[in-house]
Amino acid sequence: IQYKVKYQDNTPFDDFYLKAFPSMKGYFWYFPLENGYAHIGAGDYERKNNNVFVDEFLKKHKCEVIKKVGRPVRISPPKNSEPFTDGRKTVGVGESIGTVYPLLGEGIIPSTWCAQLFIKHITDFNAYRREVLKKFQIYALVFKFIQMKINGKFNLFKNAVELLKIYNHMKHEEKRYGMEVKFKDLMKVSRI
């Protein structure tokens, strides 16, 4: 669920704000826009906590709700979304084939990367497929991590290499994700 809201006086935050749910199966977000507008919302795997967090935030930070928008976010990676084409006229690009970073639910920038790959390989769908799978390979690993956490099958010792790969990816991409990535924080997520 997501709301577009308008604050008359002060906005709650000058920058974006994310808060993971205690279950680590979803999170609340606040994204400021311009002139007192913002997007606030929440989403979780089980769809249990969305309204609780949003309602608490709306009560604490008074604003006018402009509109309500809600839809599921697909976090299944491209590897799990094949085939990308029907072989005739239709080719999947972006979020339709899973270019959403599963740990954060962010898909706008990855979808533009995917669109660039599509344009680059518009006459060779096999090359497009190969390059998409390579570019978004880490998404499959992150998705597997999330599935193991949800199903209670993650083991820190057995899955340490995978966790380190996820950390290295996020650490290398700190600027892109707009956050400082600390290994201790990823360890907290892995223990929950």
Where are these regions (language model features)?
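Conserved FAD-binding catalytic core of PHBH/FMO-like flavoproteins
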Residues: 1-51
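Low-complexity, flexible helical/coil segments
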Residues: 9-18, 37-39, 54, 74-81, ...
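FAD/FMN-dependent oxidoreductases across multiple families
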Residues: 46-120, 124
